[in-house]
Amino acid sequence: MAYGDTPYDEQLKRAWEEFCDKLKSAQSLIFNDTLGATALDRATGFQYLSRYISKALSEKFENDPLYPQLWQLQTPTNKSFGDNPDCTYLVTWLDGAHTYKIAGNRGTVSWVSFLVNGAEFNITHSAINNSQLKTEWDGSFQIMLSAQQHPGNWLKLGPGPNFLFIRQFFGEWDTEEPMWIRVERVGDFEPPPPLTPERLIRGLENAGNWFLSDSKRWVDWVEFYSDQPNQWVSKMPGWAGDGQTGSLGRQLQFCYWKIQSDEALIFEVKPPRCAYWNFELANRWFNSTDYRYRFSSLNGKQAVYEDDGSVRIAVSHVDPGIPNWLDVGGHCVGMVNQRWVEAQEHPVPTAKLIKVADLPRLLPPNARRITPEQRREQLRRRKIGVDRRFPV
């Protein structure tokens, strides 16, 4: 067959070219940036865009609310919008006119949440969190999703498109068991119809538009915090809603960090009693930094505590010699995201920028320290945990 052999060829060609033109135009987002103007930031900027291509196609084309299939939103090699290294994200689109059922087993993962958002990021229709999920003695559970209420676990669907967002927060990466889970539309149905040119054309248009708008959204997010470097801010951009849209029960704080090669940003805080807490690094493009081979995040089960129950965390280019280290991986600017989950208090960590060389004399005599052998063991367990959570 050759071009022109079907009546749809011209439309398909135009749709593909327009999609590719949108991808090409996004380069201005990287080259016009002033925050991350190093070679590393440029390279990771285009990596950011390349990852968004697959996300755009998954979000706006490779899904059908009538035949829902859960897919992994974030992985170690496909990241976006401040992904949490502790978290496995499962998502799919649903139609508010239908009824769906989730079935699965809770596993032993530290914390889970089920969220139904509208078509817009800042609209939440319903949520079930860790403490609200009703399970059987063996950990099995079922959740109904519909516009009309059901007994037991139920998530309300809004009219039109609904985005199901499932989070699993792992504390001990190398031991906790993930949920087993599936979703289906209730009823008897024929298999989905074959792909049509019309659906492909519509999907490419929607994916291209979403790629342009959403990739810019997270570049703007980091810029929102950049005028207050090395300090914590709980406010979020106006389009993000009340700051808790992502998962009810969370309290989020953000810090735009700016650190030279001989500096360290020291956080100190006494964590409150809570279901889960963490600190995580993201680069200028709001992608988590390498968490398989570097210490780019820390949670309550991984942390080493001081005698008084506090934690001391160093964000730096070089190993500071204390247990809780966040390795910037060559970046000089980026974000730290911090979460308290199901906590009665939400303390703000102290933040102090120092010279790495000054750290030993600034530490109290009884401060926790770490040997090179202990650091290697930390990293070994970390890689095992990532490989276990994201098997081939």
Where would I find each of the regions flagged by the language model?
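A compositional/structural signature for long, glycine/proline-rich flexible linkers
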Residues: M1-V392
